[in-house]
A protein has these predicted regions:
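Hydrophobic alpha-helical segments
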Residues: 1-158
Length: 158
């Protein structure tokens, strides 16, 4: 399966892409730990089946020195011992915020309480925005058939 459309080759798509990238900078430059950002991005992408984004965030984690066992266990984080309570709370929010059609009422009060226990308001804002942004990025990747495997570390460095 080949990519259906190169969004950035289109004027509207290119404008959207630039603005979408600018919103990424707000999150990247936030106080939310970089490792947490990448773990959440990877988990959202796994849930959504976006090979392109799984490729990106797996390689970014590895390139930052994240141990392979943690990268490999993101998909089964609930059944592992390698994530901190703060990371577990962020991963729970990522899953519940991604699977909103599968859950009622979306993000549970219990998960929200866990997240509030570990993150201040600025970190929480960045985390919520990251989950929303990754869901949007995954949908773009899946709709356009962006395939995983070709990403090179730092390709989108800001």
């Amino acid at each position: 399966m080949e990519s259906r459309f190169t969004l950035t080759d289109n004027e509207i798509g290119a404008k959207f892409g630039r603005r979408f990238g600018n919103t990424s900078l707000v999150i990247i430059q936030s106080a939310l730990p970089k490792t947490t950002q990448e773990l959440v991005s990877l988990r959202v992408s796994q849930v959504n089946g976006c090979g392109w984004c799984v490729d990106i965030h797996t390689k970014e984690l590895a390139g930052a020195g994240e141990p392979a066992v943690r990268i490999n266990l993101v998909a089964a984080w609930r059944e592992s011992t390698v994530f901190t309570p703060a990371e577990q709370a962020a991963l729970a929010l990522a899953e519940e915020g991604t699977r909103i059609a599968d859950a009622n009422p979306g993000v549970s009060d219990a998960t929200w309480a866990q997240v509030r226990e570990h993150y201040d308001d600025d970190q929480l804002a960045a985390l919520v925005c990251l989950v929303a942004q990754m869901n949007a990025a995954n949908r773009l990747g899946v709709i356009l058939h962006q395939r995983g495997g070709a990403y090179e570390l730092g390709m989108f460095a800001s």
